[in-house]
Amino acid sequence: SGKGKGEKCTSACRSEPCQCGSKCQCGEGCTCAACKTCNCTSDGCKCGKECTGPDSCKCGSSCSCK
């Protein structure tokens, strides 16, 4: 049981659907992503500017707002 990609979301993660780092991104099929460039919070995804929520956040090699 590690923190790799594909890990199922915990209930705590489901309550905060847009998180980055070693945490889950429940908005992306409940998988964990090694997203280091954005700062996602339960209030939405902050990618240098605020996005409207998990669905407007796209985390990858670079972070952007859809």
From Swiss-Prot:
Cited InterPro entries: Metalthion_mollusc
Tagged with keyword Metal-binding: yes
Superkingdom of source: Eukaryota
Amino-acid positions noted as binding Cd(2+) 6 in the UniProt annotation, renumbered to this chain: 47, 59, 63, 65
Residues annotated to bind Cd(2+) 2: 13, 18, 32, 35
Binding positions for Cd(2+) 4 per the UniProt entry: 38, 51, 57, 65
Comment block on domains: 14 cysteine residues are arranged in C-X-C groups. These are thought to be the metal-binding sites in other metallothioneins.
Family statement drawn from the similarity comment of this UniProt entry: Belongs to the metallothionein superfamily. Type 2 family.
General function of this protein: The metallothioneins are involved in the cellular sequestration of toxic metal ions and regulation of essential trace elements. Binds almost exclusively cadmium.
The protein's name: Cadmium-metallothionein
